[in-house]
A protein has these predicted regions:
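Glycine-rich Rossmann-fold phosphate-binding loop(s) that bind the pyrophosphate
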Residues: 21-27
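Flavin (FAD/FMN) cofactor-binding and adjacent substrate-gating region
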Residues: 99-173, 179-185, 190-192, 197
Length: 200
């Protein structure tokens, strides 16, 4: 087994669950584990891609199962907006068909997606008045999808974490997981916190 040597004595803490990574996925996992009574600890190092994205979603996918997951995610965003202001708003999503294969996929997705095919002559009227007119030459059509949404990433993550902490979870910011080993049914995790201390 690998032995990790750290300076000084390591404080040892037993937790019900440990989540490494505090983006949208890790924060949501911490929230749901907390609501299940597991008293999880979320270890977050920095601000990753979840803080830089548009915090939105769309139900337009090439398979219906992914669209179904997206619709359920949309319901979660609506619930979050009812709890606190996350700048949630419904939008439309545009996917351009760059070849016949893509066009066939977009048309097929209408069986499980609320949207419409937009022809090049209607791009300005249905997508945006100032749209680049050269797109008419490049793309044979576009799919305009309804039931899409956006929200502010930081507000969404902060609210999700707040709900998790309120339910019994905790967050360790500016911390790093430096080692993980398995011990039977449990895991030993070594974390360096923001004070430079090592905790197991």
């Amino acid at each position: 087994p690998e032995v990790i040597i750290t300076p000084g004595e390591r404080k040892k803490v037993h937790v019900g669950a440990l989540v490494a990574g505090g983006g949208i996925t890790g924060s949501a996992l911490m929230r749901y584990l907390a609501e299940a009574g597991m008293k999880p600890v979320l270890i977050n190092h920095d601000r990753g891609s979840s803080w830089r994205n548009i915090a939105g979603g769309r139900p337009n996918f090439s398979v219906p199962e992914l669209s179904d997951i997206a619709r359920h995610n949309h319901e979660i965003f609506k619930e979050l907006q009812k709890i606190s202001e996350v700048n949630y708003r419904e939008i439309k999503y545009v996917t351009f068909a760059h070849d016949d294969v893509m066009m066939s996929q977009l048309e097929a997705s209408l069986a499980w997606t609320d949207g419409e095919i937009v022809m090049p002559s209607d791009y300005a009227a249905k997508i945006a008045p100032g749209i680049n007119p050269d797109l008419k030459k490049r793309y044979s059509a576009a799919l305009l999808t309804n039931d899409c949404w956006q929200a502010t990433p930081g507000k969404v993550i902060d609210l999700i974490r707040h709900l998790g902490v309120r339910a019994g979870g905790s967050v360790e910011e500016d911390s790093t997981v430096t080692g993980v080993s398995r011990n039977g049914r449990e895991y030993n995790v070594i974390v360096q916190n923001h004070r430079g201390e090592y905790i197991e």
